[in-house]
């Protein structure tokens, strides 16, 4: 019989030293790449995610273009060296599905109708993964889109919450994601007060779910504040 590993100690401290509501440290480096229209290196704890935006540009193949709006193309990939066990470089079903999930989360904010017959390409490259990469990917993509000057109704801010050792905790790391009882990634759009991605693995009661949702929105608001600060620092120059 294997004993379940304790992930939160009696003092309420998690394996990486955080309290149950604490997020991992976040670092945002805008304009990280020279050849993209917009880019960011987004670090959240051990997660290191590069997002690059190209466009709006002509659509190839031509028949894929839409007469009334731009198409968003999202490619989420994990580098072979991003996980503890080397991952195959071939795209997995998970990566293809997450590319679609992320595109859906972004489609509700990008003003695609301003750029008919064009494509906006968003690349999300996970260089190092430590759980929550889909929501960190959406967070990073919004920053890269803003960096590219693409108009949006709001900025998507993501964070996962979950149930670990019977408690609802914010921003799960890899071991909490794998060994915890539930994992719930969400993406929130503060300017619209709307959620554009919500998934859940595992089991929670209705009460726990309500608590998780409220903690997820609070966490996303903290992420949003950091996104806004990073964009203001780069783009709002104080006149002297
Ligand atoms: O990353 P996210 O939580 O959005 O997606 P997941 O499918 O729930 O994966 C959770 C974590 O498992 C990832 O962030 C990686 O740390 C890890 N993982 C892995 O080690 N190898 C894979 N092929 C896929 C995920």
Cite the ranges covered by each PLM segment.
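Polyanion-binding surfaces on beta-sheet-dominated domains and ring/shell assemblies
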Residues: 1-240
């Amino acid at each position: 019989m294997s004993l379940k590993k304790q992930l939160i100690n009696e003092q309420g401290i998690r394996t990486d030293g955080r309290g149950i509501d604490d997020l991992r440290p976040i670092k945002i480096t805008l304009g990280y790449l020279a050849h993209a229209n917009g880019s960011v290196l987004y670090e959240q704890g051990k997660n290191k995610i590069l997002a690059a935006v190209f466009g709006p540009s002509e659509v190839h193949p031509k028949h894929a273009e839409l007469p009334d709006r731009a198409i968003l193309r999202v490619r989420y990939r994990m580098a072979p060296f991003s996980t503890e066990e080397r991952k195959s470089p071939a795209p997995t079903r998970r990566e293809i599905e997450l590319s679609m999930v992320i595109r859906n989360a972004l489609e509700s904010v990008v003003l695609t109708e301003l750029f008919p017959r064009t494509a906006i390409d968003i690349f999300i490259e996970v260089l190092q993964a430590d759980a929550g990469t889909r929501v960190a990917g959406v967070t990073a993509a919004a920053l890269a889109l803003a960096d590219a000057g693409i108009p949006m109704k709001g900025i998507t801010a993501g964070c996962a919450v979950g149930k670990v050792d019977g408690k609802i905790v914010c921003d799960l790391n890899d071991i909490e994601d794998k060994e915890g009882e539930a994992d719930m990634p969400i993406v929130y759009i503060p300017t619209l007060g709307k959620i554009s991605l919500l998934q859940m693995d595992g089991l929670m009661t209705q009460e726990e779910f309500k608590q998780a949702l409220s903690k997820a929105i609070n966490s996303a608001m903290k992420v949003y504040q950091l996104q806004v600060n990073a964009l203001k620092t780069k783009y709002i120059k104080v006149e002297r």
